């Protein structure tokens, strides 16, 4: 739960911009080129523009935002993008949320709050590794907090690795003229995660408190090879094959988690 500071009487609108950025990775091993292609097709179908639109619509509801406009696109050969413009004030009936075009007037709100997602499926050309990355941004202007959507996004996208950034920009002025650069308490993004989420992940923080920048990296603690194999079971592989695949997968996870290639 987001803990607000003592309620402020503001001079006008709350001008703070709060932005939560996610990079969520799913890692998989597919033995043959044909299996890797089927993995890409599977991911492309599971996370097409329609499904992503529903996920982001749920996010808008969770954070208490109202939908202004939705733009979505599936790409060839793979990938999808969805952008939803949101506001604090009611604009349309929720039953209309699935319509792409609401009104030309929503262009005026494009510098305000929005939720976006882009997907990036890819495969290694030789080693059988396939990954899926979802890049999600939730940016709000005013009292709405994107942190409320943390647990829903992590659970919904079944994440192996999560890289999160949260930052607060701008200021809001109270009735006495004093500027406030943040309107809620936060020491770490981890404090906003549910217990069942925290129990499953190894996490590290890199925070710059004086700049209101918070960064958390997470990866699953437990490694179950079957969870990473596509169209295959570990019991059908030889011990040597299992060890080779496990080494490849763990290396891939470590490199994505740290954001750099490890030396041989």
Curated annotation (Swiss-Prot):
Keywords: Autocatalytic cleavage, Decarboxylase, Lyase, Polyamine biosynthesis, Pyruvate, S-adenosyl-L-methionine, Schiff base, Spermidine biosynthesis, Zymogen
Cofactors, names only: pyruvate
PTM statement from Swiss-Prot or TrEMBL: Is synthesized initially as an inactive proenzyme. Formation of the active enzyme involves a self-maturation process in which the active site pyruvoyl group is generated from an internal serine residue via an autocatalytic post-translational modification. Two non-identical subunits are generated from the proenzyme in this reaction, and the pyruvate is formed at the N-terminus of the alpha chain, which is derived from the carboxyl end of the proenzyme.
EC number: 4.1.1.50
GO biological process, one term: spermidine biosynthetic process
Modified residues (Pyruvic acid (Ser)): 113
InterPro entries recorded: AdoMetDC_fam_prok (IPR003826), S-AdoMet_deCO2ase_bac (IPR009165), S-AdoMet_deCO2ase_core (IPR016067)
Single Gene Ontology MF annotation: adenosylmethionine decarboxylase activity
HAMAP family in the cross-refs: AdoMetDC_2
Similarity field: Belongs to the prokaryotic AdoMetDC family. Type 2 subfamily.
Functional summary from the UniProt entry: Catalyzes the decarboxylation of S-adenosylmethionine to S-adenosylmethioninamine (dcAdoMet), the propylamine donor required for the synthesis of the polyamines spermine and spermidine from the diamine putrescine.
Protein name: S-adenosylmethionine decarboxylase proenzyme
Gene symbol of the encoding locus: speD
């Amino acid at each position: 739960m987001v803990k607000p500071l003592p309620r402020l009487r503001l001079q006008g609108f709350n001008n703070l911009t709060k932005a939560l950025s996610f990079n969520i990775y799913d890692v998989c091993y597919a033995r043959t080129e044909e299996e890797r292609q089927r993995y890409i097709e599977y991911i492309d179908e599971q996370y097409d523009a329609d499904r992503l639109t529903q996920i982001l619509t749920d996010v808008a509801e969770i954070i208490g935002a109202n939908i202004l406009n939705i733009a979505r696109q599936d790409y060839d050969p793979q990938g999808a993008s969805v952008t939803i413009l949101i506001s604090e004030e009611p604009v349309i009936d929720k039953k209309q949320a699935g319509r792409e075009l609401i009104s030309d007037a929503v262009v005026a709100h494009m510098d305000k709050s929005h939720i976006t997602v882009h997907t990036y499926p890819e495969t290694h050309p030789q080693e059988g590794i396939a990954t899926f990355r979802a890049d999600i941004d939730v940016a709000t202007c005013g009292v709405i907090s994107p942190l409320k959507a943390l647990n829903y996004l992590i659970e919904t996208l079944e994440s192996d690795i999560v890289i999160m950034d949260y930052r607060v920009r701008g200021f809001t002025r109270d009735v006495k003229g004093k500027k406030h650069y943040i309107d809620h308490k936060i020491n770490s993004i981890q404090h906003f995660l549910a217990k069942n989420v925290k129990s499953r992940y190894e996490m590290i923080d890199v925070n710059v408190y004086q700049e209101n920048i918070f960064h958390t990296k997470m990866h699953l603690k437990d490694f179950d090879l079957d969870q990473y194999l596509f169209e295959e079971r570990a019991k059908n592989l030889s011990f040597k094959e299992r060890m080779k695949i496990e080494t490849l997968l763990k290396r891939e996870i470590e490199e994505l988690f740290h954001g750099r290639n490890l030396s041989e």
